[in-house]
Regions:
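Acidic, contiguous internal or C-terminal segments within carbohydrate-active enzymes
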Residues: 85-86, 94-96, 173-224, 371-373
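A contiguous, surface-exposed recognition patch within enzymatic or periplasmic domains that forms
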Residues: 72, 79-81, 89-93, 205-213, ...
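Short, well-ordered beta-strand segments enriched in hydrophobic/aromatic residues
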Residues: 78-83, 196-204, 365, 407-409
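Extended, loop-rich substrate-binding clefts of extracytoplasmic carbohydrate-active enzymes
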Residues: 55-66, 71, 134-193, 221-226, ...
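N-terminal secretory signal peptides that target proteins for export/translocation
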Residues: 1-27
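Terminal accessory/anchoring regions of large secretory-pathway or extracellular enzymes
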Residues: 54-59, 316-490
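Acidic-aromatic substrate-binding/catalytic surfaces of carbohydrate-active enzymes
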Residues: 75-151, 307-338, 350
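Bacterial N-terminal signal peptides
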Residues: 31-46
Length: 495
């Protein structure tokens, strides 16, 4: 535990934004690095050794070959992460149980194409990466795109930061002269849960102040699990809708068909339903999370990062979805030619979930970090929302019966451990708890349990307590139906 805390403090101090004139901040940073280097890294002044699988309290870091690429694998009993530094520092795959979340371009498997600085072609390998925002070609304050850019396609340096109890690597990218930025990203897991942590740093390496947003771009595989030549008809992207949205209808269709029936706002959520109509849609979601839901397999990925309500986001967008598929725009008829037609390319099915940071002005040498977390879990297309301990399909319900208090609901949990029911009376006083079953992120939680609750119980909540005994928060909360009788004699005569 001391190692994990020291590692976190070192990372925060080392990469937090400081002014070059702040001598005290630099001194604190240097002192913390000296004190913690042996604790965090296992040796003074060096990174953890590579070249072998190293385990520590339930997680491993190892070199591997992934689909023909030299990769680094982070793994625990729930997840495997395949990181390919050569491909612009991409996280190429996240496997949860036996389910692969991310899209991989089969035509480029095992290949590497250096940045095309002449024709500016973009090579889409798939996976997950960091890009700058805003995009555009109108001035130097917009990014013209990934084609030929070092930050997207040049090799990144990889360093193993720790082998346990936190398994962490750092990816350091090249300087990108187009935007004057350098990206540095830490990716880590522990042995305690399937949660994945990201610490993405953008650093101004130019000689003048610059303002940018950094964006996590994750390509999720939207092909049918039964036939990869077909799209998955039960595939969704979900994020909280903004009730005071700056966009008409609560979202902005940037590319594609503006009347795409796959876009909807209902019950406080913006949803993208995959329907083979490609396009990009922007939202100004204030919720701080985005979920990608595969209703066919009941696997869901929840991404979280802190939303800053007073900050400026690129063109007001906080969460963006992009889907491949037909653009549904008329084009010219095919030319009549005697030349044989090229064989059609295989279909490409993926959904991008793009998470934006605020727009940040950085002086030369300054840096900014966006922290985010991924939580793989189980949930189908009944998905209705997220808490800090899980996702909800059917909300919690509590029914008083002669046999006891019956709790029901459908959830996906983010942490392994135990479910604990908390009981409250009409006055909101805590009057007891009871175990309500096990929490397993790899299994859908179909809650159906009868508990012996105190007779005055008027409200109940169900929390997830992890294997370390830490309360991760409620899955849901509900009033008991029918409610218990009101106590007599209170307030002059009962209610």
């Amino acid at each position: 535990m001391q190692e994990a805390k020291c590692f976190q403090k070192t990372r925060q101090l080392f990469e937090s934004p400081i002014r070059t004139s702040d001598k005290r901040a630099r001194a604190r940073r240097a002192g913390t690095l000296i004190v913690c280097s042996c604790v965090v890294l296992g040796m003074c002044g060096a990174f953890a050794p590579r070249g072998r699988a190293a385990s520590g309290k339930g997680c491993t870091v190892s070199e591997t070959n992934f689909d023909g690429w030299k990769a680094e694998q982070l793994a625990n009993q729930w997840v495997k992460l395949e990181i390919v530094p050569q491909l612009g520092g991409r996280l190429m795959q996240v496997t949860f149980g036996d389910h692969d979340f991310l899209y991989i371009n089969n035509q480029l498997k095992g290949q590497y194409m250096p940045p095309d600085t002449e024709q500016h072609r973009w090579f889409n390998y798939g996976g997950d990466k960091i890009w700058p925002m805003p995009e555009g070609s109108q001035d130097e304050q917009h990014w013209a795109g990934a084609g030929g850019e070092p930050l997207d396609d040049a090799p990144y340096d990889l360093q193993v930061l720790s082998h346990g109890p936190t398994c962490a690597v750092r990816l350091t990218g090249p300087v990108d002269p187009q935007i004057g930025q350098q990206y540095i990203r830490d990716i880590s897991i522990t042995g305690e849960s399937p949660a994945i942590s990201f610490h993405a740093v953008m650093k101004n390496v130019s000689g003048y102040p610059q303002t940018w947003s950094e964006q996590s771009v994750s390509q999720y595989n939207a092909a049918s699990p039964n036939d990869p030549t077909q799209f998955n008809p039960d595939f969704w992207g979900v994020t909280p809708a903004n009730p005071q949205s700056s966009y008409l209808n609560g979202y902005h269709v940037r590319t594609g068909n503006p009347t795409n029936s796959g876009y909807s706002v209902k019950d406080g959520l913006f949803r993208v339903h995959w329907n083979n109509m490609g396009g990009e849609v922007w939202t100004d979601s204030p919720g701080g999370w985005v979920a990608v839901v595969d209703g066919t397999t009941s696997y869901t990925m929840l991404e979280r990062r802190k939303f800053e309500p007073t900050a400026e986001y690129p063109d007001k967008s906080t969460i963006i979805f992009f889907t491949t598929g037909a653009r549904n725009r008329p084009g010219p008829p095919p030319a009549q030619t005697a030349q044989p037609a090229e064989p059609p390319r295989p279909p490409t099915y993926y959904m991008e979930a793009e998470v934006n940071s605020p727009m940040i002005e950085l002086a030369p040498g300054e840096s900014y970090a966006m922290d985010s977390q991924w939580y793989p879990t189980r949930m189908d297309s009944s998905f209705q929302g997220a808490t800090y301990s899980g996702v909800t399909g059917t909300p919690l319900a509590a029914a008083a019966t002669p046999n006891g208090l019956v709790l029901t609901g459908n959830f996906g949990v983010l942490y392994p451990g135990q479910l604990i029911a908390h009981f409250y009376n009409r006055g909101g006083e805590a009057i007891g708890t009871a175990p309500a079953g096990d929490a397993n992120p790899l299994q859908p939680l179909k809650l159906q349990i009868t508990l012996q609750a105190p007779p005055e119980t008027a409200r109940v909540s169900v929390h997830v307590v992890d294997t370390q005994g830490l309360d991760r928060g409620p899955l849901g909360e509900a009033f008991v139906n029918p409610p218990p009788p009101a106590p007599e004699g209170r307030g002059g005569g009962g209610q």
